[in-house]
């Protein structure tokens, strides 16, 4: 089982950071990536029970939100991964989760994801390749969110 762990600190309060990152369609709707909500969550559109499809780099991930505790934590699991032709990939996702914790006036975000590729002999190698790519993608997403949120915080505090 391969685990990704990416960390960043965003100069904004936890609720604001949580709201931005748990807004799946906006947070995951970036250049080279498309996300749409297939099913709304139980108590919150983006909350527990929500199902999203994320298309990126020739793959489509169907993910379900399995835990939702604003503004501290949410979890998801990839239920299915297919290529652009609809062929299922051999990919087992244990879970992914994001934790949001106050860090002074900012928020620390920890993003974890655990998965395996059950292919004899090559699986361990493919896990590392995919894991490094995914970690880079997670970092980029968090950096974009950081830039947007810190820009809002700065522009929101500017007096005329």
Feature locations, PLM:
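A conserved amphipathic terminal alpha-helix motif
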Residues: 108, 115-160
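Hydrophobic ligand-binding cavity/cleft-lining segments
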Residues: 1-44, 160
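Generic structural detector for well-ordered beta-strands
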Residues: 7-11, 53-55, 64, 99
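Hydrophobic beta-strand positions in extracellular immunoglobulin-like domains
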Residues: 10, 113-115
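Hydrophobic-ligand binding "helix-grip"
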Residues: 29-32, 42, 58-108, 114, ...
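Short structured motifs
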Residues: 3-4, 38, 48-50, 61-62, ...
């Amino acid at each position: 089982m391969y685990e990704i762990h990416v960390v960043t600190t965003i100069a904004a309060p936890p609720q604001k950071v949580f709201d931005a990152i748990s807004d799946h369609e906006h947070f995951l709707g970036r250049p080279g990536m498309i996300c749409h909500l297939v099913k709304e969550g139980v108590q919150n559109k983006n909350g527990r029970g929500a199902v999203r499809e994320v298309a990126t780099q020739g793959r489509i991930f169907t993910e379900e939100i399995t835990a939702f505790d604003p503004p501290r934590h949410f979890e998801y699991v990839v239920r299915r991964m297919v290529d652009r032709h609809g062929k299922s990939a051999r990919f087992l996702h244990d879970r992914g989760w994001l934790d949001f914790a106050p860090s002074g006036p900012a928020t620390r975000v920890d993003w974890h994801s655990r998965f395996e590729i059950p292919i004899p002999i090559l699986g361990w190698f493919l896990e590392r390749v995919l894991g490094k790519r995914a970690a880079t993608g997670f970092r980029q997403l968090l950096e974009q969110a950081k830039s947007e949120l810190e820009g809002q915080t700065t522009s929101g505090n500017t007096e005329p």
